[in-house]
UniProtKB/Swiss-Prot annotation:
<dbReference type="InterPro" id="IPR006336">
    <property type="entry name" value="GCS2"/>
</dbReference>
<dbReference type="InterPro" id="IPR014746">
    <property type="entry name" value="Gln_synth/guanido_kin_cat_dom"/>
</dbReference>
<comment type="similarity">
    <text>Belongs to the glutamate--cysteine ligase type 2 family. YbdK subfamily.</text>
</comment>
<dbReference type="InterPro" id="IPR011793">
    <property type="entry name" value="YbdK"/>
</dbReference>
<dbReference type="InterPro" id="IPR050141">
    <property type="entry name" value="GCL_type2/YbdK_subfam"/>
</dbReference>
<dbReference type="GO" id="GO:0042398">
    <property type="term" value="P:modified amino acid biosynthetic process"/>
</dbReference>
<keyword id="KW-0436">Ligase</keyword>
<dbReference type="GO" id="GO:0004357">
    <property type="term" value="F:glutamate-cysteine ligase activity"/>
</dbReference>
<comment type="function">
    <text>ATP-dependent carboxylate-amine ligase which exhibits weak glutamate--cysteine ligase activity.</text>
</comment>
<keyword id="KW-0067">ATP-binding</keyword>
<dbReference type="GO" id="GO:0005524">
    <property type="term" value="F:ATP binding"/>
</dbReference>
<keyword id="KW-0547">Nucleotide-binding</keyword>
<dbReference type="Pfam" id="PF04107">
    <property type="entry name" value="GCS2"/>
</dbReference>
<protein>
    <recommendedName>
        <fullName>Putative glutamate--cysteine ligase 2</fullName>
        <ecNumber>6.3.2.2</ecNumber>
    </recommendedName>
</protein>
Length: 379
């Protein structure tokens, strides 16, 4: 029998969080292509927990596997503080948001590694302009079959999670009209968006083998869906979120994803289930989430009606209520009620711009919010 208690040695639903940060010059407020200069020192401190990305103005970090949301918070705070400290030694800082409000992709340098040269060779301008930043959350799985079963039903909630995470309303100095322009940009890549459903782990593996055999991909990591079984970690990886600006938002979203997986697994164990919806209808909600975020309406396909997104976020928090106490994440999950009612990072960025008519002020506020409650590494 699967344990839902994180203290149990048999608890499978561990957490891992990956964040992609922007490297920024606090004077000009522009992105700086500087990751290679801080990477060596960063690896001495963080080892495999720091990685470069395609653009040199981005740095990726990843937590160790965590059993509780409190462990995950400590890891995220440590990683943000370390990267911010390394950047500060070079007169720079970091931002966590889905896009940079003013910088252009045309001014960015590509990281000179063979992997990234291959990406640019294949994707051409699509790769060069993919100056976006996300947060990925890994939830451990008991086995491959369970991962597919849970992916099939958890897909329904991806637009809800996206709406809560939106942090990319600006792009190259323009108000895009989207709450998550990052999602719109990423949709230009192949094998992105809401995943299809699969009848079994074997069917999914046959799909992967077909793509590899026909030279579509050379590795299952090039399946970039919003939710996927990770090919090496034994996790279900949520990839739908914009980068979370505040640590509190990052941790609340991760807690929700863990609780959602546990709730759905509990339903399976009690011989109840959640309907598997077609990708086409979930995509309708994803469009609404990336366009209007929490200010719009999503479709409740059970009721066959539009419902205010904010109301559905309250329903989602209530849906996972029976598991959050055992997981020890009630406080973190219920923080999302504040986000639902008060707005996401995208809403706050837009509010700053309305007040100041100055995107530099938006950048300044993002710098402050990214490091709220984060001791900056002084080594």
């Amino acid at each position: 029998m699967t344990s839902y208690n994180p203290a149990s040695p048999d608890f499978p639903f561990t957490l891992g969080i990956e964040e992609e940060y922007q490297v920024v010059d606090p004077q000009t407020r522009e992105l700086r292509s500087y990751i290679t200069q801080i990477l060596d020192r960063g690896r001495m401190i963080l080892r495999e927990q720091i990685k470069p990305e395609l653009h040199q103005s981005m740095v990726e970090v990843g937590t160790q596997p965590c059993r509780t949301i409190q462990e995950a918070r400590a890891e995220v705070v440590r990683l943000r503080g370390t990267i911010a400290g390394l950047a500060r030694q070079h007169g720079l800082t970091i931002i966590s948001a889905g896009t940079h409000p003013i910088s252009s992709w045309m001014s960015q340098e590509i990281t000179p590694f063979e992997r990234y040269k291959g990406v640019v060779e294949e994707m051409q301008q699509l790769a060069l302009q993919l100056l976006i930043f996300g947060m990925h959350v890994h939830v451990g799985m008991p086995d491959d079959e369970v991962a597919i079963e849970l992916m099939n039903v958890a897909r329904y909630f991806l637009p809800h999670i996206l709406a809560l995470s939106t942090s990319s309303p600006f792009w190259m100095g323009r108000n895009t009209g989207f709450k998550s322009y990052r999602s719109a940009l990423f949709s230009n890549f192949p094998r992105t968006g809401i995943p299809p459903s699969f009848h079994s782990a074997a069917e999914f593996q046959n799909y992967v083998k077909l793509l590899i055999k026909t030279n579509c991909i050379d590795d299952a990591k090039k399946i970039y869906w919003d939710l996927r079984p990770h090919p090496y970690f034994g996790t279900l990886e949520f990839r739908v979120c914009d980068a979370a600006t505040r640590v509190d938002e990052c941790i609340a979203l991760a807690a929700l994803m863990q609780a959602l997986v546990v709730k759905l697994h509990l339903m399976f164990s009690e011989n109840t289930t959640f309907r598997v919806y077609r990708r086409a209808v979930i995509m309708e909600n994803k469009w609404r989430a990336q366009r209007w975020g929490l200010d719009g309406k999503l479709i409740d396909f059970g009721k066959r009606a539009e419902v205010e997104a904010k109301a559905l976020m309250h329903e989602l928090v209530a849906f996972v209520d029976e598991v959050v106490d055992e997981l020890g994440s009630r406080h973190e999950v219920e923080y999302l009620l504040n986000v639902a009612d008060g707005g996401s990072s995208a809403d706050r960025q837009l509010a700053v711009f309305r007040e100041t008519n100055d995107l530099h002020a938006v950048v300044d506020n993002l710098i402050v919010e990214t490091l709220e409650g984060v001791p900056v590494y002084q080594g």
